[in-house]
Amino acid sequence: MSPPSATAGDINHREVDPTIWRACAGASVQIPVLHSRVYYFPQGHVEHCCPLLSTLPSSTSPVPCIITSIQLLADPVTDEVFAHLILQPMTQQQFTPTNYSRFGRFDGDVDDNNKVTTFAKILTPSDANNGGGFSVPRFCADSVFPLLNFQIDPPVQKLYVTDIHGAVWDFRHIYRGTPRRHLLTTGWSKFVNSKKLIAGDSVVFMRKSADEMFIGVRRTPISSSDGGSSYYGGDEYNGYYSQSSVAKEDDGSPKKTFRRSGNGKLTAEAVTDAINRASQGLPFEVVFYPAAGWSEFVVRAEDVESSMSMYWTPGTRVKMAMETEDSSRITWFQGIVSSTYQETGPWRGSPWKQLQITWDEPEILQNVKRVNPWQVEIAAHATQLHTPFPPAKRLKYPQPGGGFLSGDDGEILYPQSGLSSAAAPDPSPSMFSYSTFPAGMQGARQYDFGSFNPTGFIGGNPPQLFTNNFLSPLPDLGKVSTEMMNFGSPPSDNLSPNSNTTNLSSGNDLVGNRGPLSKKVNSIQLFGKIITVEEHSESGPAESGLCEEDGSKESSDNETQLSLSHAPPSVPKHSNSNAGSSSQG
């Protein structure tokens, strides 16, 4: 059966069953549910449109919204699935969640009893040959196709498969050859010609029940000869279709073709209108085509908020999930954060793609050098990474009123990007100097925060968005010295004395009066030696001394500096009358 005809200007798109839509889009694609809280990122919307960024407004502010309408549709010409969303920008009071777990994840409504068994295959030149057949992987034949009757020779059956538009196709499934293999023969060439499939495209076979089979298509993008992508006219859905001036359909009309550049599916006018309406607080609509290498630009608020509450630093090991080509499983790739800020490019200072990752397998992820914080997860806790840098705790800062600015657990979350009120003053640049960071942070790359406001954006007018607690403006902190960053006792009394972990804690008495002269003795192991830390504190800066196991003492200035990345060539030793008899280690 031939699929229904469609014209390039047809906007009567057919809604697709959500389970079939998600199977065609891929398991890694996340579409928030109706009435959920989301953030709209204009940068991602622009990336889905065209590379001519200069024609669009350079907005870098994420817009908090509520989804008021969702349509899961399929392109009438290419069979590619896409989502049409209507978003309503929200104010701070309207956007605050009623029940929100800071590190929780919003999974939406998933019906376990309505899942689809899926298998996708990238077409080989033989599969895409007009007169050839389709070689069916054994896993697909066993898990998606109905079982063959192997009592007959050769085992053969007829399959009736429904495409994304509801058209039914029939294929002959046979098990033959030397060695024997599963093949689709009769009916396959007709399907290839009708769908204009080429080698590199993917077909997705889906089984929803014992007698319901579906087939979908994923197009492979092909760059133009000049490396760019020009735009072909059309509506906001069919924005990259054109009509051939040479090839004709059977009825004599111009043959419809489409670009495979990966861009141009959306018009610049539609994207510009959406960005302008969003900035004015008006409802706006967006169209999203899920595709490999493109990030969702309408993201669940819970995912963004939990990821932006993390204190991302260079050297952090992360992992990212990616769907395999056959959609059979999710593969996790690991890497190390090399940069947490975009110094160049059109989105400089924006949280969009702010993390630069050095992957363990760069040849596989060579086109995924920058990702969004919500696309990755911490691969392991700091104590599991065997890194020379100790785990740094989040600091508690005094408010101007004398109390502490804290979250639910009593600790302030450093606002990673500047998504807060413009009324907040800039933090003092001195608090970001190398000398005032804990020793484990001295190896991290720092930036000139003199022109960096608390929202993380460059310039003097930070956006009036992202006003949740974890994105609240910092108070006027002044200078933070090593008085606030002293070595404390290990978090557990049962910690092994041979542990190589160096524990760092923030000062718990940042404001108020200190007690009388006191002495603390703690120990850490550094470069194979046990170091005893003695602290004398009175009303004022703490005086610390580092004592080795043999009783000798290393003098320390008020601003303690420890470089954990390289052992010092020599450590001067001074006698300590308070220590016991010394011995050679």
From Swiss-Prot:
Pfam families: ARF_AD, B3
UniProt-listed GO biological process terms: adventitious root development; anatomical structure morphogenesis; auxin-activated signaling pathway; callose deposition in cell wall; pollen development; pollen wall assembly; positive regulation of anther dehiscence; regulation of DNA-templated transcription
Result of changing Y414F: In strain: cv. Ag-0, cv. An-1, cv. Cvi-0, cv. Edi-0, cv. Kas-2, cv. Ll-0, cv. Nok-3, cv. Wassilewskija, cv. Wei-0 and cv. Wt-5
Comp. bias intervals (Polar residues): 573-585
GO cellular component annotations of the record: nucleus
Keywords: Auxin signaling pathway, DNA-binding, Nucleus, Transcription, Transcription regulation
Subcellular location: Nucleus
Source organism, top-level taxon: Eukaryota
Annotated CDD domains: B3_DNA
Keyword Nucleus: yes
Coiled coil, from the record: none
DNA-binding positions: 119-221
Composition skew (Low complexity), residue ranges: 488-510
Major site of localization recorded for this protein: nucleus
Location of region: Disordered: 483-517, 535-585
Alphabetized GO MF terms: cis-regulatory region sequence-specific DNA binding; DNA-binding transcription factor activity; double-stranded DNA binding
Function: Auxin response factors (ARFs) are transcriptional factors that bind specifically to the DNA sequence 5'-TGTCTC-3' found in the auxin-responsive promoter elements (AuxREs). Could act as transcriptional activator or repressor. Formation of heterodimers with Aux/IAA proteins may alter their ability to modulate early auxin response genes expression.
Record's subunit section: Homo and heterodimers.
The family this protein is said to belong to: Belongs to the ARF family.
Protein name: Auxin response factor 17
Species whose genome carries this gene: Arabidopsis thaliana
Lineage: Eukaryota, Viridiplantae, Streptophyta, Embryophyta, Tracheophyta
Gene: ARF17
